[in-house]
Amino acid sequence: MAKKSKQYQDAAKLVDRDKAYDVTEAVDLVKKMDFAKFDATVEVAFKLNVDTKQADQQLRGAVVLPNGTGKDQTVIVFAKGDKAKEAEEAGADFVGETDLVQKIQDGWLDFDVAIATPDMMAQVGRLGRVLGPKGLMPNPKTGTVTMDVAKAVNDSKAGKVTYRTDRDGNVHVPVGKVSFDTDKLVGNFKTIEDTIVKARPASVRGTFIQNLVVTSTFTPAVRVDLASF
């Protein structure tokens, strides 16, 4: 196991591992600990009481953060005709049909979000092995397979993030950058927490959110008190 840097070790001394912090206090602490030489991403991680072997307990969706993500998203849209024009007018960075599919098959992946109209999915489906592992495959559950391409583009540009349980029931979601004011990070954090709570599968029994932490790119995790929401 790699040895942690002195900066990380110094940051870890600021965290009481036996304490669950108020959400605002936790975010402040992460900002204080951050030592990256760039504007690091702040991320929240949920440990959920779900059995991901059960299809109805696999969470997946998307939410628009009220204060954005701090990242300019490059958005592509697979569409034709009026829908292609609609996507362009909404500010999509690249719009195309077979040509765009071919471009990706040739190795181009310089984008953050892919959106498609339903009638394009027969062609886009050929990209599953390329886009799927990178989390870029258009999907109705995340609002990226839709006829309302203008809304999808606008949401993505405004700060939409996706979430999905991994096989151990964890969900990791970015909430912004260390440079954000604490209240903006907390606002995004609360929006995600509310979204996850509302997505609770009906079949889950007992405590749904078992643990919740916030961290940045290089800092230790800080446990958050769920009662502070």
Swiss-Prot record:
Entry keyword Chaperone: no
Any GO molecular function: rRNA binding
InterPro entries to which the protein is assigned, alphabetical: Ribosom_uL1_bac-type, Ribosomal_uL1, Ribosomal_uL1-like, Ribosomal_uL1/biogenesis, Ribosomal_uL1_3-a/b-sand, Ribosomal_uL1_CS
GO cellular component entries: large ribosomal subunit
Any one GO BP annotation for this protein: translation
Keyword entries, A-Z: Repressor, Ribonucleoprotein, Ribosomal protein, RNA-binding, rRNA-binding, Translation regulation, tRNA-binding
Role summary: Binds directly to 23S rRNA. The L1 stalk is quite mobile in the ribosome, and is involved in E site tRNA release. Protein L1 is also a translational repressor protein, it controls the translation of the L11 operon by binding to its mRNA.
Family: Belongs to the universal ribosomal protein uL1 family.
Subunit structure: Part of the 50S ribosomal subunit.
Descriptive protein name: Large ribosomal subunit protein uL1
Organism listed in the record: Lactiplantibacillus plantarum (strain ATCC BAA-793 / NCIMB 8826 / WCFS1) (Lactobacillus plantarum)
GN (gene name): rplA
